[in-house]
Amino acid sequence: MTGPVMRAVGITQFGGPDVLEIVERPVPEPGDGEVRIRVAAATVNPTDTALRSGRFRAPDGVEPPYVPGMELAGTVDAAPAESVFRPGDRVMAITSARTARGGAQAELVVVPADSVVAVPDGISLVAAATLPMNGLTARIALDLLALGPGQTLAVTGAAGAVGGYTIQLAKVAGLRVIADALPKDSELVRILGADVVVPRGQEVAAAIRLATGDGADGLVDAAVIGQEVLPAVRDGGHVIAVRTYRGETERSIKVTTAWVGDYLRARDKLADLARLAAAGWLTLRVARTLPAEFVAQAHALLEAGGVRGRLVLTF
């Protein structure tokens, strides 16, 4: 390898957390309309554990090591003259791990300018890193549902990062929210804004239906329950599957998968999320910070379950 190099999290083979390592990669050069960011913080998400384990196929045409990560925050390192950003600006961004450049978990990352927004004053870079991917996943889910004020939204996996943002964005939109929670998470989910909290578990669909009468108008399945959640939704309602959907449908219920990749360059959407976070409408939850060298521990913690908020790697 010639030229300047940087540190990055690398997946050289598929397997458990122990396959993760810190590797050297060439420093990426920004092209037209791109920004290079010196990463301060990048989150660990289920998409990263899926890539590492081989549950997600390897990126097409990309040789290992694969660099995971889809959301980050840091400072601008280089930007084109016509950009609104200048070196040193505090920013957050969403990116993809499915390119030759790799994902967010590296010292320096190049992304399209349309994937970057400023971090508002008063929000730390560690906290800001938890917003782009998870917040935009919640945003696209609600955009697909297109429910109006007063309608009822159900949320599974409500205590998680996507679920929490979904609740808070739904309340901004004037929706009535019914959300699931384990007993230890019930108070958290209420604080996030749920109007009704039902027990999480095998009977969650029945509990939601009981709370609504004839079922919710729409449901965001952040817990990835699949077909078993359909009884929670009214006839002709709409279910948004986060990441994947298992099963058939029934009673004219529409099922749509929310792909955050559709919002990779939705700068206006991300800027609106940043504005809501600065105003206190969105809660940025950091479960724990770890140096990038402890990425294997972060994966193990995430896969053990029970993480509330996001695990954040620091560089």
Which residues make up each language-model segment?
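C-terminal hydrophobic helical "lid"/dimerization subdomain
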Residues: 1-4, 269-315
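Short amphipathic alpha-helix with an adjacent loop that forms part of the alpha/beta core around
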Residues: 203-213
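Glycine-rich beta-strand-centered segment in the early N-terminal region that forms part
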Residues: 26-43, 56-97
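Mid-domain Rossmann-like dinucleotide-binding core that forms the NAD(H)/NADP(H) cofactor-binding site
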Residues: 131-200
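Glycine-rich phosphate-binding loop and adjacent beta-alpha segment
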Residues: 224-282, 292, 315
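NAD(P)H dinucleotide-binding glycine-rich loop of Rossmann-like/cofactor-binding domains
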Residues: 61, 94-154
